[in-house]
Amino acid sequence: MRPDGFREAPVTIVGGSGFIGSNLADSLLSDGMPVLVIDNLSRPGVEQNLAWLAQKHGNQPAVETADVRNADVLAPLVAHSRAIFHLAAQTAVTTSLVQPSEDFDINLRGTFNILEAARRSGKRIPVIFASTNKVYGGLPDVAVREEDDRCVPCDAGIRANGIDETCGLDFCTPYGCSKGAADQYVLDYAKSYDLPTAVLRMSCIYGPRQFGTEDQGWVAHFLLSALSGQPITIYGNGKQVRDILHVSDAVAAYRGALARIEDIRGKAFNLGGGPNNAVSLRMLLKEIGELTGRKLSILYDRERTGDQPFFVADTRKIEATLGWKAHVSWRDGIRDLADWLQHHRLEPEAARYVA
């Protein structure tokens, strides 16, 4: 038995009680891998996620309550990891504008603390970081035109394939800056310290265990509001387009990245549903209305700083490198999430779109 209580080195998921983290933990545990969850348990619903995991996997995973901002506590917890998935973050653009110092400390300082803990362990622990499409900024150079209920890129290549990783980084809002700088630190630690790191720049992930109180869980927000008869506020005209990816496909990508970590060391990949799962907010709301059989109450407000009229991930790089592809269509995925929320929902706050 190891000093930390594990018979073998665990896969550590920082932020493992959250939406993506708990689904990733479930996948790893189902394959018999030891898992350590590190989380500050600050979000509503995370206790339900941990209880679900413990019930399903016989009181696993191991859980340590800790904050990424506390380097002294964090370092010994991750020092014996087989690998680290870093999913913990302050996720709201709105919060970053009001509390930029907290956003900086969690997203950038917290990521730095994890990288340093991995580096100082002397064990070349892989670190796979959950980044965001917000590192590309508002994409002012991507010209779009409005067609019916959606924005469409004028460029035929982007229209067919989406935004690829050669798109210039353009950090916007404190959230975009903190996540973008963290993204670059993770990549640089592969160059400067030979640490096996990789970055997944995520589009909109949705699915079971996503509770509607999460600022960026806008797909779940919309569904919860429809199911509860709450109004939905759209910022802008609702023609903004995003590619949405079911969490089961996201988990497969994270696991694929770990399996090929030495091959992809120091690289970043866009991760999303791609062009086949691209929807405007209006399209999604129409689908939700038909799915739930409810008339939605939709309010409109002015668009927000840094909001992208169009972001669809070009996933050809991750598909070619990892042999990964999105399997769950967006309509099937929405039905799956709606069914799950019917049985597990928390009462939502007034729903807001923050993509």
Name the predicted role of every residue range.
Residues M1-D4, W330-A355:
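Amphipathic terminal alpha-helices
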Residues A250, Y254, L271, L281-L284, ...:
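Non-catalytic, hydrophobic alpha-helical segments
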Residues G180, Y193-P196, I205-H221, S228-Q230, ...:
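Glycine/proline-rich active-site loop of Rossmann-fold NAD(P)-dependent oxidoreductases
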Residues V73, N113-E116, I244, D249-A252, ...:
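Conserved mid-core alpha-helix of short-chain dehydrogenase/reductase
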Residues L24, Y254-L258, I288, I334-L341:
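Hydrophobic "lid"/C-terminal helical patch
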Residues R69, V98, I106-R109, T166, ...:
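Residue-level signal for the nucleotide or nucleotide-sugar donor/cofactor binding architecture
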Residues M1-S203, H344, V354:
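N-terminal Rossmann-like NAD(P)+-binding domain of SDR-like oxidoreductases, especially those catalyzing
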Residues N237, K267-N270, R282-L285, G293-F310, ...:
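C-terminal "lid/loop" region of Rossmann-like NAD(P)-dependent oxidoreductases
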